[in-house]
């Protein structure tokens, strides 16, 4: 459903955000 899609998107964004914090460009 749409809820799981939103959760998946948020999870991806969170992972990307963590990588950005750990390894700033």
UniProtKB/Swiss-Prot annotation:
Name listed for the protein in its UniProt record: Xenoposin precursor fragment BM2
* Family to which the UniProt record says this protein belongs: Belongs to the gastrin/cholecystokinin family. Magainin subfamily.
Protein species of origin: Xenopus boumbaensis (Mawa clawed frog)
What is this protein's function? Antimicrobial peptide.
Signal peptide region: none
The alphabetical list of record keywords is:
Amphibian defense peptide, Antimicrobial, Secreted
Which body tissues produce this protein?
Expressed by the skin glands.
This protein's GO cellular component annotations are: extracellular region
Q: Does the keyword Protein biosynthesis apply?
A: no
């Amino acid at each position: 459903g749409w809820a799981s899609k939103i959760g998946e998107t948020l999870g991806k964004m969170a992972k990307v955000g963590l990588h950005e914090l750990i390894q700033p460009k």
